[in-house]
A protein has these predicted regions:
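Select subsegments of transmembrane alpha-helices in polytopic membrane proteins
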Residues: 6-7, 53-55, 64-66, 85-95, ...
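Small-residue-rich transmembrane alpha-helices that serve as helix-helix interface/gating elements
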Residues: 123-125, 193-208
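Alpha-helical transmembrane segments
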Residues: 10, 44-59, 116-133, 199-200
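Short membrane-interface loop/juxtamembrane segments of multi-pass integral membrane proteins
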Residues: 150-166
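Membrane-water interface of transmembrane alpha-helices
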Residues: 23-28, 60-72, 132-148, 211-217
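Active-site and channel-lining beta-strand-loop segments
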Residues: 22-52, 146-155
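Ordered, amphipathic secondary-structure segments that act as subunit-interaction surfaces
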Residues: 67-116
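Alpha-helical transmembrane segments and their helix-start/interface "positive-inside/aromatic belt" motifs
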Residues: 1-12
Length: 221
């Protein structure tokens, strides 16, 4: 699909999403839930005007993707992995649009307070996203925006390919950890879940960075 066509299709999705927000906006109470803990319990509230900001995030995300692609110093390489980039844009935009409805679903009683459904939806959704991106990461070509962008990978094509391949494996593992956390978050509690989450994401990121450096110094054959 041509990128311009995809951009306008997603723009329509974002506009319809915002229009639906405006339709339900008068029915919302003055204070709405805005944050949930790992257990699924609401632990943050804000004025209902907050939901309008949430509704705008998908469109802002879409615009950022379009701008980033054009200003990247290696923007010509985006054509070489266009399908992967388009998939990323679609997944992020649609996911942000879906997550933006959590406050409304909670207000209208579609998200039970006693369940960890929000944790499953958010953490699980991000986990699936990581797994999908991990499978496609080896196809990403050198750029300054998308993929595992270490200094050594950006300066060497071979290092970039090796780093993206390892990054793909690592993202899949991190995605699996997030999927497990999605269903165990309610049992572990907010603090323990956050610790495991940070350990997985930061640890995975550190390993990718270290691996790229080891390839650079010739330690990884």
């Amino acid at each position: 699909m041509k990128k311009n066509k995809l951009f306008w299709i997603l723009t329509v999705v974002c506009v319809l999403n915002f229009a639906a927000y405006l339709y339900f906006y008068p029915s919302l109470p003055d204070i709405v839930p805005t944050h949930w803990g790992a257990s699924g319990q609401v632990n943050g509230w804000g004025p209902k005007s907050t939901v309008l900001f949430l509704a705008a995030i998908p469109f802002v995300t879409l615009i950022l993707f379009e701008v980033i692609r054009k200003i990247d110093p290696k923007h010509q390489n985006f054509e070489k992995f266009g399908k992967v980039w388009n998939l990323c844009v679609v997944l992020f935009t649609v996911m942000m649009a879906a997550f933006s409805w959590l406050s409304e679903l909670a207000v209208f009683g579609k998200l039970p307070d006693s369940s960890n459904l929000v944790s499953i939806l958010v953490c699980g959704g991000i986990g699936v996203l990581f797994i999908i991106l991990g499978n496609f990461m080896p196809q990403i070509k050198q750029n300054y925006t998308f993929g595992c962008r270490t200094p050594w990978a950006l300066n060497d094509e071979h290092n970039w390919q090796r780093t993206q391949r390892m990054g793909g494996y690592t993202f899949v593992v991190m995605g699996i950890v997030l999927l497990v956390l999605a269903f165990l978050g309610g049992l572990l509690g907010d603090i323990a879940t956050l610790i495991v989450l940070l350990a997985a994401v930061l640890g995975g990121s550190a390993w990718i960075y270290l691996y790229s450096y080891l390839v650079y110094v010739g330690k990884m054959k």
